[in-house]
A protein has these predicted regions:
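Zn2+-dependent metallopeptidase catalytic domains
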Residues: 1
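Bacterial N-terminal signal peptides
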Residues: 4-18
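Predominantly soluble domains enriched in secretory-pathway, periplasmic, or organellar proteins
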Residues: 18-332
Length: 332
């Protein structure tokens, strides 16, 4: 099938920011560099994934039932693929050059060739396929789904080879390739589950200290710390990834859906549906919020790409603001 048959091409040009918009974040730890329009995209936007080889990233346009492809070098939308069912999680697997798109609406995982988004395979998980992670060390793709499991997919065959059972539906999870463990947010069970990937089973839990709705998660592998953001109350909890000991517990913005570590600057970025990105700085084991960067209400998903040294925030369409990706440059 040709590219034109599956992709509706867009001509959205990069938006030149007015001086006032640039000045609003000038001197801040995150400076707004560009706004990339996504075209006629309505509703909620979920997660993002990057393809560094082609300098492009993929956008799960959940409310639009589509997948967007953005050219990072040109700061413009390249194409969009319609016909999905509430896409949530995305992962790019470089060894096979395949994009994995997890759909909440029908529980499927669509495997698409990254070059032109033509279909390679479809895996039926049954319900609520969600976050996607690439396990490079074990050459596997993991997808959280249903009432409580991580599906394990072999990228060479494109087939599901195992399930790792959990107590309830998994939200964000991270893989520690150095230890062969995964840490999984399971909010309906009120816990963070520790998984042994070689055994394919849960081996323990970390405390949540009475906090609820743990959705975003990041792993600071170098410092051996796990960063988890809760929505009720809105808190950033920092744990030792070795034993779950609490290192920090600080207030953050509401309705968070993504958190990232900037190892170069010892910072943490939390994107929130409250319409802000919280910026924390780590100093001698303590975490202090140094700024709160305004975005747009419901702009709660984001992607920090260390190789590009940029934070990309997904902004859904609203009165006065079209759907787009806001590009922030960390400073200094």
């Amino acid at each position: 099938m040709s590219t034109s048959a599956v992709c509706a091409l867009l001509v959205a040009a990069p938006l030149v920011l007015p001086t006032a918009a640039v000045a609003e974040t000038a001197g801040a730890p995150l400076e707004l560099e560009a706004k990339i329009p996504l075209g006629a995209v309505s509703g909620r936007i979920d997660h993002l994934a990057v393809d560094l080889k082609r300098q492009q990233f993929f956008v799960a346009e959940l409310g639009n039932d589509s997948l967007g492809v953005v050219n990072l070098a040109a700061h413009r939308t390249r194409s969009t693929l319609p016909g999905l069912k509430e896409p949530q999680g995305i992962g790019y697997e470089p060894s096979t050059d395949v994009v994995y798109v997890a759909n909440a609406g029908d529980g499927s995982v669509r495997l698409l060739w990254a070059e032109d988004l033509t279909s390679k395979r479809r895996i039926e998980l049954g319900a609520d396929a969600d976050n996607v992670r690439i396990d490079n060390a074990r050459n596997r793709v993991l997808v959280g789904y249903g009432k409580g499991a991580l599906a394990v997919i072999d990228p060479k065959s494109g087939a599901k080879v195992a399930d790792i059972p959990l107590k309830a539906h998994p939200e964000s999870f991270q893989i520690d390739e150095s230890t062969g463990r995964a840490f999984v947010n399971v909010p309906d069970a009120g816990e963070i589950t520790v998984v042994d990937l070689a055994k394919g089973e849960a081996i323990g839990t970390f405390p949540t200290k009475g906090h609820r709705a743990n959705f975003p998660m990041a792993l600071d592998s170098e410092a051996q710390r796990l960063l988890v953001v809760f929505r009720s109350p809105p808190r950033l909890l920092v744990l030792s990834s070795q034993d779950g000991a609490v290192i920090a517990d600080v207030d953050t913005c509401g309705d968070a859906d993504d958190v990232f570590v900037d190892p170069k600057r010892h910072r943490v970025y939390v994107s929130c549906g409250a319409g802000v990105v919280d910026v924390f700085e780590e100093r001698a084991g303590s975490y202090q919020r140094i700024d709160r960067i305004p975005t747009v209400s419901s702009a709660r998903t984001s992607l920090f790409v260390p190789d590009l040294d940029r934070l990309f925030v997904a902004v859904r369409a609203s009165p006065g603001e079209p759907a787009g990706i806001w590009v922030f440059r960390p400073a200094p």
